[in-house]
């Protein structure tokens, strides 16, 4: 399935069976291909044959195009090259600036401190603290990661 077919997965419920609108998904696929610089010969190229970074761009672009009020990502850049990682980070930051609640699950403290407003820290499957990313540091977050109830967490 190419990018256009992949875009149609999100609009299938809105369609009318065999009379599904194919122009909107094609236009969206073209826009994502160009704006996110997806490296593929065409929007009909099978997504499953693309590199991991390009697949990630297609999926994140498709979800953002739905104009969600909440966008949740888990390890959004795991295994991606640095350029693609920054593309994804920039997309998430743009969404945050538009008022979308972005829930970012990750483990790179530098990235979390840069991207997030608040950080919910887990330890042993339990919340050990909630900190303001603008006023905390890696040492405080690290302390919260190692023991439940420890550290001087500010409830944000």
Residue ranges and their predicted role:
Residues 1-156:
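Glycine-rich phosphate-binding loops of nucleotide-dependent enzymes
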């Amino acid at each position: 399935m190419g990018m256009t077919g992949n875009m149609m997965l999100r609009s299938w419920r809105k369609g009318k069976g065999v009379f599904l609108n194919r122009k909107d998904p094609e236009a969206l696929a073209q826009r994502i291909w160009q704006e996110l610089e997806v490296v593929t010969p065409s929007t009909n190229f099978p997504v499953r044959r693309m590199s991991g970074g390009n697949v990630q761009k297609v999926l994140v672009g498709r979800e953002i195009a739905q104009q969600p009020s909440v966008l949740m990502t888990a390890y959004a850049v795991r295994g991606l090259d640095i350029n693609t990682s920054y593309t994804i980070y920039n997309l998430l930051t743009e969404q945050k600036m538009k008022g979308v609640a972005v829930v970012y699950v990750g483990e790179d403290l530098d990235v979390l401190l840069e991207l997030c407003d608040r950080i919910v820290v887990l330890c042993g499957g339990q919340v050990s603290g909630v900190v303001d990313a603008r006023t905390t540091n890696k040492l405080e977050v690290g302390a919260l990661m190692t023991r439940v109830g420890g550290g001087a967490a500010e409830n944000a």
